[in-house]
Structures are given as C-alpha cells and as structure tokens.
Amino acid sequence: MGRTLESKKQIVEELKALLDQAEMALVIDYQGLTIKEMSDLRTRLGPSSGICKVTKNTLMRKAIDGDTSWSSLESLLNGTNAFVLVKGDVGGALKAVQAFQKETKKSKTKGGLFEGKLLSQDEIKAIANLPTKEVLMAQIAGALNSIATKMAVGINEVPSGLARSLKQHADSGEN
C-alpha cells in the first residue's frame, strides 16, 4: 500500500527541516545494502551529527524545490539514493562513510553538496582527509607557543651575548 498524500507532505516537511540544519548533503547509491548495513552506517554517523535518510527522489526533489542552497542536488536525484545530511563534524561524517564503503564494498558516493557547491568524488575525499577542528586548533596553538618560546629565547640572548662579550673583553684586557 502506498503512502498517503498527507504522509508524503509530512516527509517533505521533515526533509526541509533536516536540510535547514544541515551543512552538507552526501548522496549515496545504497543498492545492495542490507538493513543491518544501513543501521551500521547510521550508527557510524552518530558521533559526527550525521543522519542517513532513505527517501524517494521525488520527495527530496520537492524538499529542495525553491531552496537555492540545495537546488544543485537535483542532478544527483536518480537511482537508489540514501542521503547523508551532516550538521556537525563534516570531516568525521565523510570519514565514517568512506570507512563504511571500504568495508562493505557495496555502495558508492554519487556526489555531495557543501555550502551550495556540488562536490566531485575527489573533493569529497579531500574534505574527508582534512584534520579535525581539534587537531587544527592544537597545531595552531603549538605554532603560537613555539613563536613565543623563540621570542623569549631571542630576547634573553641579547643581554647574555652582551655579558659574554664584556667578559671576553675583560679577560683579554688582563693579559
């Protein structure tokens, strides 16, 4: 038995709400995946605030209709699609999807949309390979700390160098 018009409208509204919160959308061909494997993917996406939704392309088309930030997804809406909507850690979600695909070898990423730009396979891989925000912040903090340390050593070296020069001059004057 098919869905009623009312339930379809409710699904479209739910998709619109998810898209409003999402920073990125990833379109995956899920053909051949079992329910258990889809549950595994959803579990993996949890820590990165990603959601995996399987819905008809026509319902997703209605959800993005008139929304310029998501309208580029239109070109990916064919075949059997699962939509990964990420509202948190984009890199973490992409890494989770890639690890899942590597293990199952059953699904492939058709493309994605990030900040209104359609992403190719290579661009998606590049984003997934970026370090996490925490790692980047640690690297920046380390770089700033090393600059401060080098400045302190440099500032301390001026009087020390002067003292060594004076001592050397005084020692040479005694002879």
Curated annotation (Swiss-Prot):
GO terms for biological process: translation. One of its GO terms (cellular component) is ribonucleoprotein complex. InterPro entries: Ribosomal_uL10, Ribosomal_uL10-like_sf, Ribosomal_uL10_bac, Ribosomal_uL10_bac_type. Pfam families: Ribosomal_L10 (PF00466). GO terms for molecular function: large ribosomal subunit rRNA binding. Belongs to the universal ribosomal protein uL10 family. Part of the ribosomal stalk of the 50S ribosomal subunit. The N-terminus interacts with L11 and the large rRNA to form the base of the stalk. The C-terminus forms an elongated spine to which L12 dimers bind in a sequential fashion forming a multimeric L10(L12)X complex. Forms part of the ribosomal stalk, playing a central role in the interaction of the ribosome with GTP-bound translation factors. This is Large ribosomal subunit protein uL10.
